[in-house]
Amino acid sequence: MISGTLSAAETNYNVLFIQSYTNSSSWHNNLIAGLQDGLEEGGVKANVVIEYLNADFWTFASECVIMRRICERARQRKTDLIVTSSDEAFFTLTHCGDSLPYQIPVVVSGIKYPDRKLFDRMPNVSGFTSVTDFNVLLEEAIRLFPARKEIVCLSDSSFLSAKGVEAVEEAWESFHKKHPEYSFKELNVQRKSLNSLITSICYDYHAHKYIVIAPKWIPFLS
């Protein structure tokens, strides 16, 4: 956590934990337990309130409306610290138009596509990233599926999805030099009809040759 923000000598802090998805996610209880255990081990007494953004369901504009409501509730509770889980929660928090994340400490976790310039402008933010190594994933994919020679990258039009595609394309450059027999294409699920996407990926005559990568979870995968 941010040095000097919470300490064992101070008690009863109000902590807001914003998760990117829903409480039906299989890992959400582990995240909550991890935060509560960490606070307890640090000797910090805190009231932890959990909010869920449900980013898989809403458009970004709707996420911003929801996040502003979350911030207003947090402000009314006199929240001392915000903790976020995964990219969507932090990105929407800092782009929803509310000033709260710029006024109090924010701890991030599980950020795959960090915006370094934003972090530089927010000295009140700390935490850790978990950047995906797509070079390792591509190598493992072809080891498991040696007969599949076409890499398909699924994306949507969101900022985070675009950042994910950039990361995959960067890994693809070195991968393709090592494995020139492979091909690569990106499919944006918001630029093609659902039927055409399903047909081209799942029911096409050559579908058994595809390795599909989704650098960011998108509702299409549901």
PLM-predicted stretches and their roles:
Residues 4-222:
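Short hydrophobic alpha-helices and adjacent helix-cap/hinge residues
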